[in-house]
Structures are given as structure tokens and as C-alpha cells.
Amino acid sequence: MKCPDETLEVLGWKAHFREQVTSEEARQCHPVRVMAVHRGKIDVAGAGFQRFIAPYIPGATPSDDHPTVGDWLLIDRDTLQPVRVLRRINLFKRRAPGDPRKEQMIAANVDTLFIVASCNQDFSVARLERYLVLAREVGVNPIVVLTKTDLTDSPETFAAAASAIEPGLRVEPVNGRDPASVARLAAWCGKGETVALLGSSGVGKSTLVNTLRGSDSIATQAIRARDGTGRHTTTVREMHRLDGGGWLLDTPGMRELQLSDAATGISEVFDDFIAVAQHCRFSDCAHGVEPGCAVRAAIAAGEFTSARFDRWRKLAAEDNVNASHVKRRTPD
């Protein structure tokens, strides 16, 4: 990823960021965007230059104060050291693997989220719902991209299952290896636009990135025939320049996306249950054996499936547990 000649606007600079910079900061600092995050260093680009710098900001203690891919920073013109992270438009984050007290930042300042799933045995409505909850929570427009349509005789079956998750959800089936097929995603990849890419291991994200870029620079791995899955081949979070002038952010495959403080997103994705629950006899109804439960009545009447109900309760319970861990979090 090279961008030494880009202007700030091409990199995604918007009024939201420009208005945060004081006149003194404008004289003393360069605004730069984080294009990639590596261990112990970040790749940043600004107007006319690109370089690696240390990611450490003096005095920053909360994790949200440290830069992640997609962030805009101010760096000192003389020392090129980070001064501060500009206030984000949005931030994707999850529970850190192995430590429920901590959060892991995924990406910042995203315009559109491509939720990638494959048309094979690895397709999971539950996993799509998790990603949709995340998108709704941070207020980013989600597009479900179904890959490997060339490997199935019935891509419309997978598209119908994805579309049924939420009314009006945009679903785009593509053959990730075919530029003509992938071109249907161009509407979200224009100049200065940032698209994030999320999906589990082996769904074809790297192949999709290569086609969108017109390049084979991202390593891909063959899928395992026995179960339709594969290993992810992206090892760093990185932004890739697209032919249409936008930027695509690829992330390592994540099978277990742990939600945190996502009550709003859950309510939006499962708003059908939320609406019916207002008619339960008791305001604190747990939708179990309580008398007068409108949700259970709707399931019995065939308005909802038990499977979707179980997924709703599972995500809500997971979010409650993880949110409580955050509240109890103590500094190391």
C-alpha cells in the first residue's frame, strides 16, 4: 500500500476532523491517517508523505486514546511523534481474546461495512447477526457480501437467508475472483470513502480484496474441502487503495466476535422482538414461563422462529456479561 502523493481528502479527510484542529495545531502538526497497524509501529500517510512511526502518545492511558487503523492523528512537524488522536466518527471494537476486562479496537472512521460470508457450509445466520449488531451499534451502513457464488448451484438460497435477517438489508452475491461480478460493490468504494471488511476465516476476504484492488498482493489460502472453511491469511489490519479512489480496510478473520455495550445494536437488529415484548403482561418478563408473555405467544403463532429467539437472548446475555466486565475493569 503506497500513497505518497495523496491529498488529505483522497485519504478520507472530512470536515468532522478539520474542525477539531486548532490554529496552533495547524501550525505545529501534520494530520495523518493510520493506514496499517503492526506490532510496535503504525504506518501513517498524510499530504505528500508516508512513513512508519511509533504508536505511543504521551499521557494516553485509555485504550481508546491509542491509534488504530483508520484513525486520524496529529503528529509533530519536527519530531513526527503522535500528539493526539482526533475524535472519531465511529469505532469498531470487541472483547479482547483471553481477557474479558479489555477491549480490542478493530477499525475507526468507517463509512460502509462489508460483511462477508461464503455460499457454503460455513454460512451462518447467527454470525451475520453478530456483525449486523456491531454495525448498527456504531451507526455504519452494512452491506452483506456473499462470496463463492461460483461454487454453489443455488446462491439465491443463501441470499434469501441473509435478506430475511432484517428488512431492507442490502445483500450482494459476488464471485470474488470475477472483476465484473465484484464491480457491483463499486458504489461504496468511491474517492475518499472507507469500507471495512469483516468476516470469519476462509470466506474469501483476501480474494475479494485482490479483485477490488486489481492486484494479487494479498496472500490467499485454499479452502478445506471437508468443511468449507479455511485459515485467514490477513495478519495485520491494513487499508488498501481501491481503483475507484476509496479505501478498503481488511482485518484478520474473527470467528468469535464478542459484543460489548451493544444494547442499541441488538435492539435494532431484533426490533421485531423488542416491539412484541412491549405487550408482555409484566414489564420485566424474561420470556420464559411467565404468564402473559407476548413473545412466547408470537413464537407459538409462527410469527417468529424459536431459533431466532434463542439467538436474540444469547446475544443479549453475552452483551450484559461483557458490559459488566468493562465496568469492573481495573488497570493492570
Where are these regions (language model features)?
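Helix-rich effector regions associated with P-loop NTPase G domains
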Residues: 1-7, 25-28, 62-79, 85-112, ...
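Conserved beta-strand segments of the P-loop GTPase G domain that flank and frequently precede/overlap
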Residues: 115-118, 145-147
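Histidine-anchored nucleotide/phosphate-binding helix
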Residues: 126-137
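Canonical P-loop GTPase G-domain recognition
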Residues: 141, 148-203
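Walker A/P-loop
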Residues: 201, 206-207, 211
